[in-house]
Amino acid sequence: MASALGAQASVAAPIGAGGYGRSSSSKGSNTVNFCNKSWIGTTLAWESKALKSRHMNKIFSMSVQQASKSKVAVKPLELDNAKEPPLNLYKPKEPYTATIVSVERLVGPKAPGETCHIVIDHGGNVPYWEGQSYGVIPPGENPKKPGSPNTVRLYSIASTRYGDSFDGKTASLCVRRAVYYDPETGKEDPTKKGICSNFLCDSKPGDKVQITGPSGKIMLLPEDDPNATHIMIATGTGVAPYRGYLRRMFMEDVPSFKFGGLAWLFLGVANTDSLLYDEEFTNYLQQYPDNFRYDKALSREQKNKNGGKMYVQDKIEEYSDEIFKLLDGGAHIYFCGLKGMMPGIQDTLKRVAEQRGESWEQKLSQLKKNKQWHVEVY
């Protein structure tokens, strides 16, 4: 997920709003002071294995095959002791200089556009929680404000607090390269490309990157009930925070968090080649069939019940009875992705509610009151 600072979430509240805290079960007595920037995580004595993606020789921190056999030990466990999430440790005027570890293409050749998985080394100095965002300041001068640095762009973090290396020293971003094509000529106009996304996707290992944050509370994964149900709805790179949730639930061995509930992911993309982290998610489906469900809406390959393109709201309608029953039982529902996805989803939910003899306005109000409704769109 990416957005300009100040235009991050446009539905219920800004990303940092809502006062949505976190309480974790079985927390230790020691507390990490997130306000102290000198805190550095303990080095993890565990070497990760390589995973080749279905599209190219892409290296991740461990293999899906290993994850299927046993969960991965993570360190430092003190990252789970804090009672409140870290917030705005680094601000735009004083960003933290991190280092690019790797940049890998996530999508196949038939995907419209390019999406990259970018691992950043912050040395344990910019800790975060699942569901938060980093700000990135691309190098150069703001074209609209000569003499000023470029505007901060916010990206949802696509890893757990322990990072893809499981040592608390890295964070991963899921970034779609923003390009502009002239509607008349059909040719790409490099002068109008996304400054930050292209900087990140063009980065090389060892390059420096200025980051701010972490920011955001509304998409934090509530952990007070380890048996809760979480319904996650995403389009494209909106899947980023959910990857962090799911790795925490199913991949990592965190003594203070043992997930026993249901995680249900709905992902909408153009086609099969556009699927993001599909191999990871499919592995969870195979290994935890009682705790994970995974439904895809491929708009260029699938048809909805009316013969039109299959969008994520069509999948929601298909399973609407189950979804509403789960919400009535206290399930959390999350939306992350393009701002344009929300009107169609809201219309679908309203129509389904009316068919059930319910008022969607009242139901939505109750979901927000109960802190079951989480939205981050851009």
Curated annotation (Swiss-Prot):
Catalyzed reaction equations: 2 reduced [2Fe-2S]-[ferredoxin] + NADP(+) + H(+) = 2 oxidized [2Fe-2S]-[ferredoxin] + NADPH
Its EC number(s): 1.18.1.2
Chain residues that bind NADP(+): S156, R176, T237, V269, A270, S299, R300, K309, G337, L338, E376
Name the record gives this protein: Ferredoxin--NADP reductase, embryo isozyme, chloroplastic
Record's subcellular location: Plastid, Chloroplast
Pathway: Energy metabolism; photosynthesis
Keywords linked to the UniProt accession: Chloroplast, Electron transport, FAD, Flavoprotein, NADP, Oxidoreductase, Photosynthesis, Plastid, Transit peptide, Transport
Stated family: Belongs to the ferredoxin--NADP reductase type 1 family.
GO biological process: photosynthesis
Cofactor(s) listed in the protein's UniProt record: FAD
